[in-house]
């Protein structure tokens, strides 16, 4: 019996590892800049796709090895559209980007290269959380791993762009949230006049007990408080201190599409990337209480639970689990997947 349990645990652990993600490439004004996740690329990439779970670790800045510059730096101008492309394994049509259980917010920070490398001066320039019953990560998966920002009108110089995912599938326990991030090296060539605010320190922007970090996505909720500072409005230079769970609404500058010379790499371009134009922090609601027993490893098994509740659950909605009393039937084309004993989710068949 112990042997069987051990094998199941190893299988679950292997599945979790395969579900992780890193940034593989960047597009500028819809032009592919080629793979950037190597020592001779433009992304300060970690040695593997494992998440950071300790919010006090210096690896929170740019991930493991993130203090080490890489060979290339991308040239951008104010108003350029920069698209980040995430994958869990390869830049292929078959890549699943990240596990559909790893729901959570997607954010982007920016800092001058020297300050950012030291963990200081980080300004949030985009965010997407939970809206209309759908997580930002769900949109990321649907868009084949792509999400976009607009380069603000900052002074010329070298900067780091820091895209980030927070996966909350284990966020119902302290230290369970998984952080994925890399730093992309860019050089702004336009002479902007909007100096970045002082920004926040990373590590330091998040606490393990922040409502958007310690968050139980397995119980009923209607909104989600995106952690960290408010999104910079692109013009003010005031404090960018941590806003925690306070509501804030900001609008990013409009996108100006101007082609940049580059070498294109073959990659699927059929999906339209998500562009963060308006980033909204909804009013805070208290995070639901975590289950009395800690959730187990991701089993990934299909669930055929039945219950008395009626109605069909939409994609990525909960459809089962211990102490769950809601609808258990998924909409057509979906199956009810058991991620752990406490949470079953409707996903594509």
Swiss-Prot record:
Subcellular location(s) per record: Secreted
UniProt entry keywords in alphabetical sequence: Carbohydrate metabolism, Cellulose degradation, Copper, Disulfide bond, Glycoprotein, Metal-binding, Monooxygenase, Oxidoreductase, Polysaccharide degradation, Secreted, Signal
Keyword Lipid metabolism listed: no
SMART domains hit by this protein: fCBD (SM00236)
Main location: secreted
Any GO BP annotation: cellulose catabolic process
Glycosylation sites per record: 323
Disordered as annotated region, ranges: 233-304
Record: residues binding Cu(2+): 20, 102, 180
Residues reported to bind O2: 169
Membership in a protein family: Belongs to the polysaccharide monooxygenase AA9 family.
Domain notes: Has a modular structure: an endo-beta-1,4-glucanase catalytic module at the N-terminus, a linker rich in serines and threonines, and a C-terminal carbohydrate-binding module (CBM). The CBM domain is essential for binding to and subsequent oxidative degradation of polysaccharide substrate.
Protein known as: AA9 family lytic polysaccharide monooxygenase C
Organism of this sequence: Aspergillus fumigatus (strain ATCC MYA-4609 / CBS 101355 / FGSC A1100 / Af293) (Neosartorya fumigata)
């Amino acid at each position: 019996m112990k042997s069987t349990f051990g094998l199941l645990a190893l299988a679950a652990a292997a599945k979790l590892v395969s579900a992780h993600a890193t940034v593989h490439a960047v597009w500028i004004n819809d032009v592919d800049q080629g793979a950037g996740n190597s020592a001779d690329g433009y992304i300060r990439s970690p040695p593997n796709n494992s998440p950071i779970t300790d919010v006090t670790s210096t690896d929170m800045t740019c991930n493991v090895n993130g203090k080490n510059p890489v060979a290339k730096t991308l040239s951008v101008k104010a108003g350029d559209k920069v698209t980040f492309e995430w994958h869990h394994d390869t830049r292929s049509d078959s890549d699943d980007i990240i596990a559909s259980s790893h729901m959570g917010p997607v954010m982007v920070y920016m800092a001058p290269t020297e300050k950012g490398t030291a963990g200081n001066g980080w300004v949030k320039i985009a965010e997407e959380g939970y809206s209309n019953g759908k997580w930002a990560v769900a949109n990321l998966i649907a868009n084949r791993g792509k999400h976009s920002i607009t380069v603000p009108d900052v002074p010329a110089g070298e900067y780091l762009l820091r895209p980030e995912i927070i996966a909350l599938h284990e966020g119902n326990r302290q230290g369970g949230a998984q952080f994925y991030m890399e730093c992309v090296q860019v050089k702004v060539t336009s002479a902007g006049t909007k100096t970045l605010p002082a920004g926040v320190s990373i590590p330091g922007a998040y606490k393990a007990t922040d409502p958007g970090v310690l968050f139980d996505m397995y119980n009923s909720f209607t909104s989600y408080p995106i952690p960290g500072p408010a999104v910079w409005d692109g013009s003010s230079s005031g404090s960018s201190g941590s806003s925690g769970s306070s509501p804030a609404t900001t609008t990013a500058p409009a996108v100006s599409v101007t082609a940049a010379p580059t070498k294109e790499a073959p990659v699927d371009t059929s999906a339209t990337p998500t562009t963060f134009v308006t980033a909204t922090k909804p009013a805070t609601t208290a995070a639901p209480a975590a289950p009395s027993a800690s959730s187990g490893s991701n089993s990934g098994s299909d669930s055929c639970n039945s219950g008395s509740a009626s109605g069909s659950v939409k994609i990525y909605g909960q459809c089962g689990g211990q102490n769950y009393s809601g609808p258990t039937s998924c909409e057509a084309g979906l199956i009810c997947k058991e991620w752990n004993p406490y949470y079953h989710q409707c996903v594509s068949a």
